[in-house]
Amino acid sequence: MQIDLKGDRPIYEEIYEYFKDAILEGRFKKGERLPSKRALAKEMSVAVNTVRAAYDALSCEGYIESVEKRGYFVSEIGSLYNFKAQPINAARPEKKSYKYSFAITEGDKESYPIDKFKKIFTQEVIYDEEFYERDYQGLYGLRHEIKNYLFKARGIKTSEDNIIISSGLEQLLTIVFIILDKKLRLGLENPGYKELKTLLKLNNIDYEPISLDHSGMNFERFKRANATAALLTPSNQFPTATVMPIKRRFEFLNWAYGASGRYIIEDDYDSEFRYSSRALSPLKSLDEMDKVIYIANFSKSISPLLRLSYMVLPNELLKRYYEVKPQINSTVSNIVQILVKDFMKGGHFERQLNRMKGIYNKKRLVLLDELEDIDGLHAIDSMAGMHLKVYVSGVDDYEDIVKALQMSGIKASRLKDYYLKEEAMAKDALLLGYGAMDEDEIRSAMSIVKKIILDLKK
């Protein structure tokens, strides 16, 4: 018998697997007698109890049966219908690797506070009183720290009861869709976060992409869409980096106050990364009638590996939330929540945020300096966020430039990649993110960008 006695598994499991496979493959027929326990033990130089354990497992699962004073015999096990499975073409699309990345959603992976997290984990997390707690809404301690941060840094007054912890924008929006009326019609910024289309379709949400103007989402077009909610990024519109002025903010707030069942969902995307002044106040801080659902995350400020986002719900939506709360519990582990709680409680978060702002601002200035050396390029610098919008003179469609960059090992995108719905007057641009690369990599990548643009303009 070909039984491996030197494998990682216990010997009795090897014996069990050998006979099981032999029976299933028909090498041992119904009624055929197996070697006695003593005979097999002697042949294999193992203990009788080892063979007994294997035979007991085979007997328990119905492969063999014991006949008193006669031994063990193969049972009638029937057979499965023999068919040839058709292969399913479910291969993942090949993920292209790039030497340089101007991706506008990527941050600096080398600057995340890994060492500080290690120290917090070993000294505090496993001893935390919330370590074994289960809270569908997210651990109270973290919600308390977020509440304090929102009041101090973002001017938002709320309570721990209004804060919900989850693993990302998509998960939080799914909760919002469940809570809001089934007749929800959502107005979306166009261009915007294109991946939302899949989420909206999965949740059967009626939506209308609304074009932008110099102040953000066009309010008159939004009103004509007969929406019941608006999803906005007012402090740093993604991906145009447009800042919504106070007049437009008041227009949307007054619209929300004008009828019951109307809400604004504010995604405070990258709002902390403002380099010319203090961070802009969020729409939620102006909300006197509690009609703004506020969403933010720690992806760029701490690390995207945490997958930790949070939401502030208006009071009038809490009752509905508590009704469905057990079905939509937090998807963030207690370990991660306690890590971030202690990170914030110890004052590390504010220091980390200021540190990251300094790092990204230096990269922004390097990229701007490199762009100035290329004739015919005009960069729109909002002095916020983590990418620049770049126009090339004489170019209306940037598809060829992006393709050429990708062929040269540079990850990049263009404005038209982010349109949820095509617009006749849509303006295209090259989008260059500076979060993922260090300063030297930005300079090296820009030397390739310069050559490609000059070649395409010949």
Identify the role of each PLM range.
Residues 130-260, 272, 278-286, 290, ...:
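Conserved core of the PLP fold type I
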Residues 164, 190-199, 323, 327, ...:
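A generic "structured core" feature
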Residues 206, 263, 410-411:
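Residue-level detector of anion-binding/catalytic polar loops
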Residues 279-298, 319-320, 430:
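Conserved active-site segment immediately N-terminal to the catalytic lysine
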